[in-house]
Every structure is written in structure tokens, then in C-alpha cells.
């Protein structure tokens, strides 16, 4: 089945006796649950209420993702940080698309994962102005929830793709591993919507993060990308155009891909990716701008 959810496309392929309408209704129910919990674009969501300090009680979805985010905050020495929302808003990548240069120093005073804590299922903030953005992990997490729903129905062969974040189990209709295409980034000289690499994933998940679609040019002619370094408050300047990660869960792959983009080419993304492959088994496929073209750094099996 194919359709739309979470503001993007959704594609599910599986071998099952359940009707497409049944599968679709289950996905839409999950979509509604995720939006009600974690959306920063729905003003009625629980996370939006928490960001406005109207409540502090967390549901299980928020607890899981906020705790998982701490792992990536630590791995990246703070480059990945879900409290980055005030900065992304200030740079024009939130609901308010104002592109005026913000007062970074004043905002940094209340940005930082170390300024929040979970106590008795409640979010405790050191500063009431701190706000959370889970967009870097929520879509991958939703893919996992959909996959787990399919597995609860006894479905063992499936692929779930929501906006390019993918989870797959078993084999396709031909009895082969699921094949997933990695998009070629568009960066001036490159063709849009072309496939750079097709890889197979064996009972895992894949996510890609990139800076080649969401950016703008400010009044000074500077390229401002949507990836903001929460440690400096400024847009990440990097030759790393996209980072694809294969991991056991899509939430992990989603957060890891964002983490590597936040670190960038100068911040040790490649070195950390190699370490994560060695210690955690994650695979990576990085595409860098390189003069008139691009270059690839990736796990050995993708070469």
C-alpha cells in the first residue's frame, strides 16, 4: 500500500492475508497517536504543550525518544541535541519562517540536553524557555512502531518506508533481501531525484539526513542549512551532503544520520561512524561535495 502520513509519503509492502484497508487503518491510527504525542507543528500535541510549559507529564513515546536522544547527545559530545528547537526556530526552520539573524548568545543560555531531566515521568527543565524538537528521531521511531504492529499481526516479511526512513524484515516477494536506493544529493551540478546507490538491508533499518534540500541564502549571500550546531548556535558548514545509516532500529538510524550531519566533515562524523560500525555494528554511506562532483565514504560492504 502507498499513501501519506506524518506530512510525507508512506509505503508498506508485506506478505499477509490482512486487507490493505485493515493495514492502512492501523497505520493511520499510529499516525494520529504519534502526532498527538510528538508533533511540534500541531499546537495541541503533548510535546507542544510541554514546550509551552502548560504541562510536564510525559507519555511513553516521549520518554522513550527523549531517553534515546541522550545516547546520541553523549556520543556526539553535544552536536546532536533535541533542545535545539529555539535555535532552528530563530533561524527560520520552524513554524515561523523569519530569516533575520538571531541573537545567538541569548538563546544558547537555555539550549542543551543537560538542562532537562526526566523524573517520575515528568520533564524537568532548568529554564522554562528550553524547548524540545524530536523531528530528528520521531519519523524513524514511527517506522519502528508500524513495523512492530505488522509483526504483532504475524507478518514476518515486510518493508515500511515513511519519507525515506525504512525498516524491513524477512524477504521480498522474490525471496530476496529488500533493496533500498540512496538518493544522489542535489548540489548545483548534480541531477535531482537520481539514485546514487542501491543497498540491501537484512532485518534492519535505514535513514538518511542531508542538507541539500532545506536551506536558504541570507542577505550576505551565506548558505544557511537546517542543520544547526547547538553548541555554537550556527548553521553547520560542511562538505558532507548526506549521511545514510543502517542500524537495528529506524529510530537509531534516524538519530544517527542527523548526528553525523550535525558533526559534519570537520567535526569528526566519519571517524565516529567508523567507531560506531566497529562497536555497534551500524553501517554508513556518506556523500561529500568534492569540487565539480562528489566523493563517497562508506562501509566496506557498500563499495
Model feature map: region roles:
Residues 1-303:
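Mature catalytic core of soluble alpha/beta enzymes
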Amino acid at each position: 500500500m502507498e499513501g501519506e502520513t506524518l506530512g510525507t509519503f508512506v509505503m508498506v509492502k508485506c506478505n499477509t492475508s490482512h486487507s490493505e484497508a485493515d493495514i492502512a487503518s492501523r497505520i493511520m491510527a499510529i499516525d494520529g497517536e504519534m502526532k498527538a504525542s510528538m508533533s511540534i507543528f500541531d499546537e495541541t500535541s503533548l510535546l507542544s504543550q510541554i514546550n509551552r510549559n502548560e504541562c510536564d507529564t510525559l507519555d511513553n513515546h516521549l520518554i522513550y525518544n527523549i531517553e534515546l536522544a541522550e545516547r546520541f547527545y553523549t556520543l556526539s559530545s553535544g552536536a546532536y541535541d533535541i533542545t535545539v528547537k529555539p535555535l532552528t526556530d530563530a533561524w527560520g526552520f520552524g513554524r515561523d519562517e523569519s530569516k533575520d539573524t538571531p541573537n545567538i548568545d541569548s538563546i544558547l543560555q537555555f539550549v542543551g540536553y543537560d538542562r532537562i531531566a526526566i523524573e517520575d515521568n515528568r520533564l524537568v527543565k532548568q529554564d522554562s524557555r528550553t524547548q524540545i524538537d524530536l523531528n530528528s528521531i520521531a519519523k524513524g521511531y514511527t517506522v519502528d512502531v508500524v513495523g512492530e504492529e505488522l509483526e504483532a499481526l504475524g507478518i514476518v516479511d515486510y518493508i515500511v518506508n515513511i519519507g525515506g526512513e525504512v525498516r524491513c524484515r524477512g524477504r521480498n516477494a522474490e525471496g530476496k533481501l529488500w533493496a533500498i536506493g540512496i538518493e544522489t544529493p542535489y548540489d548545483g551540478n548534480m541531477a535531482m531525484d537520481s539514485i546514487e546507490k542501491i543497498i540491501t538491508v537484512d532485518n534492519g533499518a535505514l535513514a538518511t539526513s542531508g542538507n541539500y534540500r532545506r536551506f536558504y541564502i541570507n542577505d550576505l549571500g551565506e548558505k544557511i542549512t537546517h542543520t544547526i550546531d547547538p553548541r555554537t548556535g550556527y548553521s553547520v558548514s560542511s562538505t558532507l551532503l548526506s549521511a545514510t545509516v543502517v542500524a537495528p532500529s529506524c529510530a537509531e538510524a534516524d538519530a544517527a544520520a542527523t548526528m553525523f550531519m550535525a558533526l559534519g566533515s570537520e567535526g569528526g562524523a566519519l571517524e565516529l561512524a567508523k567507531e560506531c560500525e566497529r562497536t555497534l555494528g551500524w553501517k554508513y554511506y556518506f556523500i561529500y561535495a568534492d569540487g565539480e562532483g562528489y566523493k563517497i565514504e562508506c562501509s566496506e560492504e557498500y563499495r
